């Protein structure tokens, strides 16, 4: 048993009950109620997992936040896993009180996660930049993931004044405007590059995010050269057989990895959880699947029971297999 954990009495022999030791949770599967000495060998009828406060905090290295519903967007990208579009009507908007409650839960477990604001299109939220100011003022590192169409010089300037912003990730599928706009919509290549230029001119780090597919694979090398020219990085995102991609029968690029090149420590679900529409999920990919919901509170989402559920999901869910085989 790890140092710092002493004898505790299990209040009730069932899964995920808090013990009298505030520094630990004990997951106990036992035939009957009994005091348990955590330093003593376990009987064959018992199985325990002890997670100290520092371990819980470590399990929350990333926290994905959807300021708007995943399907709320000003674009209708051909491969969107949420089938987001301007036609979608979901009134959910993250409130200031909701964000405050969320941060209180983070602080309660002494975690220092990296926040990732994503969507849908997060810049559609009228208070987004106020929320980013709150995160920045508290000293949390964070990033913004956007299609770039609503990043103007004024907003780029505001972002440049946030010292804990690590980068802005902008979706761009090809260095060829025709290919890019066939995926996102007419004129969007130019608008995305305008956002990149506005941010880079103000010293904001930028990553260009592309999803390798049959339709854009030949232009990816040119995209990498464009990124170098703009002083940006490139991130490749896996194509999931969900949402619009599934409806259209899109296929990943033939050059995309088909080998298991991911360790568990690099998976999104191993680094944290996603928060969307008032609930927590294993990752941003699964936030529209009610069966994967981990709970309404951070304690529930990070409990041993939830971690076991996530481990099982990895083995059976098709989206998890995509993450295991490719980049996330």
Where are each of the predicted segments found?
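Residue-level detector of anion-binding/catalytic polar loops
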Residues: 6-7, 112, 141, 205, ...
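Short alpha-helix
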Residues: 1-4, 193
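Cysteine-cluster motifs in flexible loop/terminal segments that predominantly coordinate metals
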Residues: 73-76, 80, 266-269, 275, ...
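Short beta->alpha connector loops
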Residues: 14, 122-124, 147-151, 174, ...
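Flexible mid-to-C-terminal extensions adjoining Fe-S/redox cofactors in radical SAM and related proteins
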Residues: 17, 39-53, 57-60, 84, ...
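Conserved alpha-helical substructure of the radical SAM core
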Residues: 42-166
